[in-house]
């Protein structure tokens, strides 16, 4: 397992570099073929190709496993943040998010095949290329395959205590553009309409839409504007990250954003954006799935599963609204996502592979 993980981590795969992600895809496809899978390469022009692997003749009522091959780290990251194993941890870009999840998936299937165990349901694994940039090309494939599945396992990293991620917030973004009027800051200051000043008023109004009781947060994370300190800025833009949990919250926020009005005469506001991933609530369907998984884990492995959640989103968010049970956080245990502190606990590779194999075999 560690050898394959090392190979995958040292094959850097930033989302926007198609050739790099395809190199990982080639490795994954090869490993799946070694396990006698029916492998299909789903091509993309600008982003990496997706890899679809099937065990069994029919995917209906089967098990769907979701993995992604892309990472947030740019090419060359290995020079300053190399793959390293020390003190029971494996460090490196993409170890936790989520190349360990790929290794765990392949190991679980390999173990079932090696002991001649036939899963009661067909197994399909989709390895996507663009999860870190919104799953723009993979979403339709995820939703199509999920509609045929009886259970979906998402191989993102677990919570630090090993808990599965049974709920996730939905994530979206608003982009706000303010137009003012440029003028010389010394000679014609009065004639100008300061777009940054106007945007300051709007930022305060937007941040006030955060509602912690409803688990709704808005974060103005990027602001741009102006060309020089001696020019009254004509334009300013912001990017707003949005996280929602409750039904109807996104619609409420859309309505509030459309109501934004200029505070200064002679300025205008333009709002755009959308919800990328809907919420993944821990509703009745997923509660039943977690209960079943917990019983299997206890009976087969003597392991007690725990349920948790996070404000971050994944491809599991696309599955929940379809009414299909989904269990996320099935991957390795570690921390430091998207940073040079990213690592997994080495022993969690085998532990989570055993868990996934048990769930596939007994679902």
Feature locations, PLM:
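Acidic/His- and Gly-rich active-site-bordering loop/insert found
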Residues: 1-93, 114, 316
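Metal-dependent amide/peptide-bond hydrolase catalytic core
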Residues: 3, 13-14, 31, 157-158, ...
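A structural signal for isolated positions on well-ordered beta-strands in alpha/beta enzyme cores
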Residues: 40, 64, 124-126, 270
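Acidic, glycine-rich active-site loops and adjacent beta-strand->loop/helix elements
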Residues: 69-71, 89, 126-133, 156-159, ...
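Phosphate-handling active-site elements
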Residues: 88, 108-124, 206-215, 363
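Glycine/serine-rich anion-binding loops at beta->alpha junctions
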Residues: 89-103, 184
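Acidic/histidine-rich catalytic neighborhood of metal-dependent amide-processing enzymes
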Residues: 98-169
């Amino acid at each position: 397992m560690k050898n394959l993980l090392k190979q995958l981590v040292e094959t850097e795969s930033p989302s926007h570099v198609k050739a790099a992600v395809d190199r990982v895809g080639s490795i994954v496809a090869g490993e799946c073929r070694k396990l006698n899978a029916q492998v299909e390469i789903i091509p993309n022009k600008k982003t990496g190709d997706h890899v679809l692997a099937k065990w069994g003749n029919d995917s209906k009522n089967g098990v769907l496993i979701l993995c992604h091959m892309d990472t947030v780290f740019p090419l060359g990251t290995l020079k300053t943040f190399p793959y390293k194993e020390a003190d029971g941890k494996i460090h490196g870009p993409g170890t936790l998010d989520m190349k360990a999840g790929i290794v765990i998936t392949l190991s679980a299937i390999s173990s079932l095949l090696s002991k001649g165990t036939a899963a009661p349901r067909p197994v399909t694994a989709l390895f996507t290329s663009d999860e870190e940039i919104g799953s723009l090309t993979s979403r339709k494939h995820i939703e199509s395959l999920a509609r045929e599945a009886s259970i979906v396992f998402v191989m993102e990293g677990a919570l630090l205590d090993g808990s599965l991620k049974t709920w996730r917030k939905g994530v979206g973004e608003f982009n706000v553009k303010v137009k003012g009027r440029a003028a010389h800051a010394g000679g014609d200051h009065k004639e100008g309409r300061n777009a940054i000043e106007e945007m300051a008023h709007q930022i305060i109004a937007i941040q006030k839409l955060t509602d912690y009781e409803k688990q709704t947060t808005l974060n103005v994370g990027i602001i741009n504007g102006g060309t020089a300190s001696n020019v009254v800025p004509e334009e300013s833009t912001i990017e707003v990250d949005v996280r929602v949990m409750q039904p109807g919250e996104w619609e409420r926020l859309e309505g509030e954003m459309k109501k934004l009005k200029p505070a200064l005469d002679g300025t205008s506001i333009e709002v755009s954006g959308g919800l990328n991933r809907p919420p993944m609530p821990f509703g009745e369907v997923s509660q039943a799935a977690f209960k079943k998984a917990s019983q299997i884990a206890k009976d087969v492995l003597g392991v007690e599963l725990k349920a948790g959640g996070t404000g971050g989103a994944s491809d599991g968010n696309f599955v929940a609204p379809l009414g299909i049970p989904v269990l996320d956080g099935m991957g390795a245990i570690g921390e430091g996502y998207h940073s040079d502190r990213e690592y997994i606990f080495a022993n969690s590779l085998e532990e989570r592979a055993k868990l996934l194999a048990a769930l596939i075999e007994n679902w």
